[in-house]
A protein has these predicted regions:
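Extended, loop-rich substrate-binding clefts of extracytoplasmic carbohydrate-active enzymes
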Residues: 71-142
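Acidic (Asp/Glu-rich), glycine- and aromatic
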Residues: 134-184, 379-391
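Beta-strand-rich recognition/accessory modules
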Residues: 215-295
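An acidic-aromatic substrate-binding cleft motif
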Residues: 296-310, 383-477, 482
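Ligand-binding face of N-terminal immunoglobulin V-set domains in extracellular IgSF glycoproteins
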Residues: 310, 346-388
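Well-ordered alpha-helical scaffold segments within catalytic/enzyme domains
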Residues: 316-318, 377, 473, 484-515, ...
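Conserved small/polar residues in nucleotide/adenosyl-binding loops
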Residues: 560-566
Length: 570
């Protein structure tokens, strides 16, 4: 009997350990309770997505783990090309083969990249081993001396979740700083070794790299963060079992960097660097995310942020953990001065799975009484919303006309009382671009300017009208024409009227929250028409785009730069 009990206990223990193993799930990534580890499940490294990604209890903690030429990479640096991805469920391993370079992007493409002159392939393997994972990296060519310590495996740590939070490296402790701080260190740039891989590439090196001395986002590795710490064992969030990750290196040191030093949108970086001659066995990490076995994603209830017109369809969406099967009945409450009243409660429609989650739909279209409402699903609640006939009358499309479009107006000074959104800008527009070049952000210039102006000529009359592209300094003609058309149709078809802004096109002054008795929509139509007509008058045709000639000017952090744009065509 004792032997039977001991055997049963051993069996239960084995079953418990197996339940705590990292296994590849049907979606093709590792899962263990509330811990998920993706290996190139998606590929968008410019946006800090892809590569090795660690998600603990619904929150992304680290991402974009891959081989890089830089300590902290920005969106303008060369990226590898993925050759293959194998999900080996039998061996509980995911293998990805990549290579530097991607020749189609060297000196060419939507955003031309500049690759160093070292061509190699590599394989990243991640294998689930009980309650931890083993990551290895093997190169197919030895690292040259000139890239020793430059090439390495980077894992980016999400800064928004870490500011003010602690870390431990071996016996050293620290706290992630809210603001990027020195010391910095200088080193030779990879741009001293640009390869010659694409004879058809038409990017202009002088325009991209300028004098190679002043700061330039194209050169990301000459002044960087000095390491915050170095060691063999790193613990992220040691104070929080829901977010704790331990990483040990069995090959070389781990180094912790602040990637915000050389990129404003940089992340913290945990890195293993490759010495000269490194080939096979470049990296071996033991990754131990803390596993919360019984964790479940808390339901999220989403209704329309705008609210609903009484006569329209009304459906709330409920997002659940895929493992949830005991569905509750959603409930709709009406909120009044004397409290809340249950209006409707019934089983939701089972919509199905999408990516990591399961979805239900709760239809309450038949509810038409005006007022404040909220959808509840157990303890989860939607934001409070309105059902009303005037639900679109304020604070919806009006915000675009009142704030977004005025702030984006080019060639103007935009004030909001004693705030200056941006000063007079781009009054030097514009100079004709070179021919036969591949510029940034999708702009190219063909073999002809298609007008009387030649490369380098000043084209008069273009310093009027237009809106900056969202986040960048360029005027795309289709955006200018399209926005002006949309606003004109809103006026003609719906009689749309809003007047909260003064716009003086002669003085080039915009005053937000200072009505001038004119329809703001029509004034914005005029702003779009001004740039289009000015281009036609100057060129005898539409321009393709007016944009800044350098990367630093093109994607500014503030709106105070005065720049010299160029005209480009596709």
């Amino acid at each position: 009997m004792k032997k039977f009990i001991a055997g049963a206990a051993s069996l239960m223990l084995c079953m418990g350990l197996h339940a705590q193993d990292f296994r590849i799930n049907p979606s093709g990534y590792f899962e263990n309770g509330g811990a998920n580890v993706m290996v190139f499940s998606d590929v968008y490294p410019e946006g800090h997505q892809g590569g090795l990604t660690l998600v603990l209890n619904g929150d992304r903690r680290a991402a974009n783990g891959d081989v890089r030429f830089e300590i902290s990479q920005g969106q303008w640096q060369g990226l590898p090309k993925m050759r293959s991805r194998v999900v080996d469920e039998a061996d509980n391993e995911i293998r990805v083969t990549l290579s530097y370079l991607d020749s189609a992007k060297h000196m060419a493409g939507f955003n031309p990249m500049l690759y160093p002159d070292f061509v190699f392939g590599y394989t990243i393997k991640v294998k689930g081993e009980k309650d931890y994972l083993v990551l290895t990296v093997d190169l197919d060519q030895p690292v040259p001396e000139r890239f020793a310590g430059k090439l390495g495996f980077n894992l980016e740590l999400v800064p928004s979740t870490l500011l003010g939070k602690p870390w431990i490296m071996d016996n050293r402790t620290g706290v992630f700083p809210h603001q990027a701080m020195g010391p910095t260190m200088k080193q030779s740039s990879n741009m001293e070794y640009i390869g010659d891989f694409n004879p058809d590439g038409k990017a202009d090196l002088d325009q991209l790299l300028l004098d190679r001395k002043t700061y330039n986002p194209m050169i990301a590795d000459d002044i960087v963060s000095a390491p915050l710490a170095a060691g063999k064992k790193f613990v992220l969030n040691p104070q929080d079992d829901l977010a704790k990750i331990t990483i040990e290196s069995e090959k070389g040191d781990l180094l912790l960097y602040d990637g915000r030093i050389n990129h404003n949108n940089g992340w913290f970086v945990l890195r293993s660097e490759f010495p000269a001659g490194t080939k096979e066995g470049a990296v071996k990490w033991i990754i131990r995310p803390t596993v919360t076995k019984d964790w479940r994603y808390a339901p999220v209830v989403q209704a329309s942020q705008v609210g609903y017109h009484p006569g329209q369809k009304k459906v709330a969406v409920i997002e659940l953990d895929k493992r949830d099967t005991d569905f509750k009945q959603p409930a709709l409450y009406r909120i009044a001065a004397d409290g809340r009243k249950l209006v409707k409660q019934q089983a939701a429609k089972d919509w199905g799975d999408f990516q990591r989650y399961h979805y239900l739909q709760f239809d309450f279209t038949e509810v038409t009484e005006e007022g404040l409402y909220q959808v509840m699903y157990g303890d989860a609640a939607s934001p409070v919303f309105r059902i009303a006939k005037d639900v679109w009358d304020k604070g919806i499309w009006q915000a675009e006309v009142e704030y977004f479009l005025p702030v984006q107006m080019c060639h103007m000074r935009v004030n909001e009382k004693y705030r200056v959104w941006h000063d007079f800008c781009h009054h030097d527009d514009a100079r004709m671009a070179k021919t036969d070049i591949n510029h940034i952000d999708g702009y190219t210039q063909g073999t002809s300017t298609l007008c009387k102006y030649q490369p380098g000529d000043l084209v008069p009359g273009l310093n009027v009208g237009g809106w900056h592209d969202a986040g960048d300094y360029d005027l795309r003609v289709e955006s200018q024409a399209g926005e002006a058309y949309i606003l004109a149709m809103a006026c003609e078809n719906f009689g749309a009227y809003w007047d909260e802004t003064s716009i003086d096109f002669e003085k080039k002054i915009v005053e937000i929250h200072q009505p001038d008795g004119k329809n703001d929509l029509l004034q914005q139509v005029e702003n779009g028409a001004l740039t289009i007509v000015a281009g036609w008058k100057a060129l005898g045709r539409l321009y393709r785009g007016i944009l800044c000639p350098t990367v630093r000017q093109y994607a500014p952090v503030s709106y105070t730069h005065l720049t010299l744009p160029t005209i480009l065509r596709v």
